[in-house]
Amino acid sequence: CLSYGGYHAVYIPTEADDSVKEYLRMRNDHKLALKKIKQQINAFCIRHGFCYDGTKWTLAHLKWLKKLEITNELYRETLDEYMGSYEEQEAKIERYDKRIKEIAEQTKYQDKVKKLECFLGIKTHTALSLIVETGDFKRFAKGNQYASYLGLAPGENSSSDSIHRLGITKAGNSHLRQLLIEASGGICKGAVGHKSKELRARQNGNKAEVIAYADKANTRLRSRYYKFIRHGKKRNVAVAAIARELACFVWGMMTDNIEMKAA
């Protein structure tokens, strides 16, 4: 029974949390649709011999796309329709992100979101997703259990005399797993110990011990990534490993175990 620790309580999300979760997932679906449209525009240009040398999806690139000299009217109309869909999706996502910021400022979420935003790679959308999708972080006894819940723990193929390590299990909450992998991709850039103005602004207003814990995590994760790369690990393998450790640090932050090392 529960009183003797024989069973663990099952977390049941509130209707409020579930509604926020659905809104966030809807936003993610539109983000995927935007990615698909970008791929379609790129493919169209390649098929018809239009190559852009600079960084794509900047203002300069968008201006280039709109001013392409295309003599075939139907080709031009096709690209214009693609560009219209692109701009429509961009406007939607901008509107959704504004609404997500408003939700994150609600009393029940604000403090937790501010804490999670102290980590490199975690901004409002990711922070709020972690909170409402996970619910009660304390149902996980350790950080590595939380990483397993997200499918970020390494698998293994064991026999009586050997253990063969595998990649991450990918068994668990795929939405949060993808968000943390994307966040880790942001961590794995830049100098170890560097704090941008944007990160300092996000950390502003938090307690000193919260910022110190996040700084420790940021430094460790970035250092670990570069160590993996120096030792010949593939980038995607290294990023997945960093995502696992980031999940452990997130668990520590949300359960007030901020003196603990990542599991």
Where are these regions (language model features)?
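Extended, highly charged alpha-helical segments
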Residues: 1-43, 193
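Short alpha-helix plus adjacent loop in nuclease-associated cores
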Residues: 1-14, 21-22, 61-68, 162-171, ...
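Short helix-capping/linker segments at secondary-structure and domain boundaries
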Residues: 5-9, 37-38, 93, 135-139, ...
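Glycine-rich, often acidic, oxyanion-interacting loops/wings at catalytic, nucleic-acid
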Residues: 24-115, 203-207
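A residue-level signal for conserved active-site and pocket-lining positions in enzyme catalytic cores
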Residues: 30, 89, 180, 232, ...
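HhH-family (HhH-GPD) DNA N-glycosylase catalytic core used in base-excision repair
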Residues: 56-66, 138, 188, 215, ...
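Phosphate-backbone recognition surface of nucleic-acid-processing proteins
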Residues: 114-118, 124, 129-231
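Basic, amphipathic alpha-helical segments enriched in Lys/Arg and hydrophobic/aromatic residues
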Residues: 223-263
